Amino acid sequence: MAAQSSLYNDDRNLLRIREKERRNQEAHQEKEAFPEKIPLFGEPYKTAKGDELSSRIQNMLGNYEEVKEFLSTKSHTHRLDASENRLGKPKYPLIPDKGSSIPSSSFHTSVHHQSIHTPASGPLSVGNISHNPKMAQPRTEPMPSLHAKSCGPPDSQHLTQDRLGQEGFGSSHHKKGDRRADGDHCASVTDSAPERELSPLISLPSPVPPLSPIHSNQQTLPRTQGSSKVHGSSNNSKGYCPAKSPKDLAVKVHDKETPQDSLVAPAQPPSQTFPPPSLPSKSVAMQQKPTAYVRPMDGQDQAPSESPELKPLPEDYRQQTFEKTDLKVPAKAKLTKLKMPSQSVEQTYSNEVHCVEEILKEMTHSWPPPLTAIHTPSTAEPSKFPFPTKDSQHVSSVTQNQKQYDTSSKTHSNSQQGTSSMLEDDLQLSDSEDSDSEQTPEKPPSSSAPPSAPQSLPEPVASAHSSSAESESTSDSDSSSDSESESSSSDSEENEPLETPAPEPEPPTTNKWQLDNWLTKVSQPAAPPEGPRSTEPPRRHPESKGSSDSATSQEHSESKDPPPKSSSKAPRAPPEAPHPGKRSCQKSPAQQEPPQRQTVGTKQPKKPVKASARAGSRTSLQGEREPGLLPYGSRDQTSKDKPKVKTKGRPRAAASNEPKPAVPPSSEKKKHKSSLPAPSKALSGPEPAKDNVEDRTPEHFALVPLTESQGPPHSGSGSRTSGCRQAVVVQEDSRKDRLPLPLRDTKLLSPLRDTPPPQSLMVKITLDLLSRIPQPPGKGSRQRKAEDKQPPAGKKHSSEKRSSDSSSKLAKKRKGEAERDCDNKKIRLEKEIKSQSSSSSSSHKESSKTKPSRPSSQSSKKEMLPPPPVSSSSQKPAKPALKRSRREADTCGQDPPKSASSTKSNHKDSSIPKQRRVEGKGSRSSSEHKGSSGDTANPFPVPSLPNGNSKPGKPQVKFDKQQADLHMREAKKMKQKAELMTDRVGKAFKYLEAVLSFIECGIATESESQSSKSAYSVYSETVDLIKFIMSLKSFSDATAPTQEKIFAVLCMRCQSILNMAMFRCKKDIAIKYSRTLNKHFESSSKVAQAPSPCIASTGTPSPLSPMPSPASSVGSQSSAGSVGSSGVAATISTPVTIQNMTSSYVTITSHVLTAFDLWEQAEALTRKNKEFFARLSTNVCTLALNSSLVDLVHYTRQGFQQLQELTKTP
């Protein structure tokens, strides 16, 4: 056998290499197809365009999908190609493939058989692709006869031979694997025959049929090999095949081998769908090493054979996953039966072997369904439905296998942890590919492949919760292949919720692989309809997750019961026994519900996502569905459509009720997805993945830890269900609110199990906040934001719990989710505003906080500060002084101007400068905060700056910048309102309000920045706006009403003082230019004087004229002009710099001339309304040409209010 195994391993390696190349090529082709679907993938993101975080995620996810493709190119490509070759159809048409390959009448059974056959065809796809269709349908239909006829003898022979042969070789392993599976089924007695034909349909007989199909379909050998291994071992452990002791021994040997092989297999479990492809592609050497270890054992051959042929199993895996779920459902009922001493014996002896084998089988994905079919589950479930009975059988065998697998995987987890390193690579790849944070959570518990296998199990386990690990992995693969059909059958599944439970596990795997990311995001809402039924399995599964930390096999039991984790097999039987009620009932629909399962997969992907093995299979499936990943947006829609089919279930309602939120969640999921790859690669990564999956994983994990800690499987299931299926609905909503949930989940979840993931979640939120508020001062705003989000997160979390508690609460949750979506949108808007103004607002709040201290010192500083403001405006020094004193109070009596500004900048600048930079635009929104900050009361503390007391106002720099943005926003709002008005007078009034806001913005800008350029531009634009206002109507005409004349005075005074402010901004430059120009003209005048004597016409005027020029720059300019005109100056060239300087100088000085001119015009109009302005000056202050802009705004606003009152009164 060892020699054969080595020979066959070589053959398998060759086949693997060939298939790898073929799959890589096909994968590349499919990848090319993926880009075509990329737009679909982008669509979901488009829904969340407004969300900065979502857009980042979109970018990340898009890149990640590509990376994921590359990472899983080998596995994915192989799987995709294998699946395509096997089914001769695209991965996505898995359901169509099933339908096309298998008659619709026997579609479910065909799916099982085909999936079983397809595994073989997958490997055969290399050389037996043509055989696959033939085998699939013939076996699907002939299976019954084959089953009945050859179930006992041929199957037993095949089993024995295959078991031994698998030890011996891999190519023969196909046939032997099938036979072995049949043999195992034979041990199950004629179950294999019935199961082949009725594997989905007939519960008790159907356990063997999957193996029979495997047997008949030698193409399915990869699965059959893995499945046979598990079957043999599980039969032995479960006592199903006492006569199969040789096979069992072979299985045991294979199991023994499998632990080592599981080194390969664990690598395979991560990419369960096509673990062999990923293993060959990733670790052919690894597989060979395990081969060296396992060669003596049958498992080695299986592992290599499975690996090569597993590649083609993507669809088979999905299809078989379909079977698996059926198997798993009965597994619950049968688990008790299957929990036999043989299991304990086999567990002890072949726990590791079984774990490896089951892992490999899961990887192969063809075995678990047959194994599931073989075992007692048929008895457990047959009563429920004829089809469910098959499913029950499958589930029961799966459960048996799972129990064995659990025990073996528990033991094997230890042994496999050694393999863990190799598996970890695959797992990381598959995890990253899967980008399933839940998978990642399980992954940390079982970093090694065996955990991944159990992890893969949880998906089906979540569905079946008692399915064997291999069954689960198979169900994962089946779900991968059948998830699409499942999503359609999910509708029927919802109709037959009790039946669907078993099928659900399968879809989770598919979803895990791709749909998990896609459907989980979108389809999960659809899945929630099943949520109530699948809720229990997910809830238990969370607990199983928790136990998976201790033992991967426990995950299986966990799926059934968190407390039974230790005795995963026994506990599983009870939980699964209930689930058979649910899932086995659903099983018959599963047969009818290939689409439904997909939906189920959508729901459960969260849970399965945790399984690393499932992650691996997902990687493979994702390889197949990678195109789907890209078109995930479409897939989300499709899945949504499927859920719509499922509309019967609440998830549909949730999806339809909150369709838009569901899309953002999908983007968020993509977000999670993108972040998941890295997390899945590292344990710390899983936490990030959780963060990414925040909604999914945090709920999932938080719920899982809770359920684990709580121990009650249902409590865990409830939280898990909310995280998984109801969480699908919730996640539909919660994903909408994913951002808030991460924080909430972080708080809730971090304490439970994934404290780091919450931190990661916090980090993510922090990243958003960081981008907006990077500095510590921003932390307050971040905390506030986090708090804002977290309370909703708490609500969301609680709502999710409620949804898990009762599906009836799903509607509430959806409403809550919708509200949360609104809240999330609000939060996002708030984040944007906060990013702009929260930094400012945080600074405002901080300043407000500091202001309390300021007032105390304000009294003293008011006394101290009044002088500085007086300099700017003696009339209103007190107000500026108060404002300054407040800010200076912060400075603690330091230099009011610089020290206050420096202290404030120290206080807030650390965060505010960046905030301002980031929030330059947002600072306008901070004007809203301005009122809250308390600056509004003294909105013009900086105005003194224009008066020349700019430094005293500088302490307000942070406030000012934030205020500047707020004022700018307010000004633009007013301006837009004014533009919409038709009445010219009303429009002019509204424009004046905008002018005042613009002036305030300029004041804040001037006080905030050292440079006066920005303030100067604001003032300049404001002056232009005032000119436009004055052009709307001749307000200053003699015939104009008194109110309009008053309005004209206010406008002209604003314009005049603004011109003075503009001059002050450029005063230093004007003085500098004046000196330079004077020097230049003096030198030029001297040069002109020399030739001037020769020119009589010139006379002394031209030479003398330059002399007075120093006195007045204008005179110097004129004299220069005269010199030029004299003709002597014609020879003198004026430097360009001088020309520019002169032009700038004239422009700057013209502001003063304009200001005086306008002021005189305003004074003339003021005389006609002395009473009004006298009262205004008394109430506010006397406005002068050198008044500060703060005084101007205060004065103008007060006068404008009085003017409006006068306008209303008449």
UniProtKB/Swiss-Prot annotation:
Modification sites for Phosphoserine: S199, S206, S212, S588, S750
Residue spans of biased composition, Acidic residues class: 423-439, 473-497
Subcellular locations according to the entry: Nucleus
Modified residue annotations for Phosphothreonine: T220, T697, T755
Basic and acidic residues bias (residue ranges): 9-35, 78-87, 245-259, 536-546, 688-699, 732-747, 816-834, 906-932
Record region (Disordered): 1-45, 73-314, 366-957, 1098-1119
UniProt keyword list: Acetylation, Chromosomal rearrangement, Nucleus, Phosphoprotein, Proto-oncogene
CC annotations in GO: super elongation complex; transcription elongation factor complex
GO biological process, one term: regulation of gene expression
Name listed for the protein in its UniProt record: AF4/FMR2 family member 1
Organism: Homo sapiens (Human)
Gene, per the UniProt record: AFF1
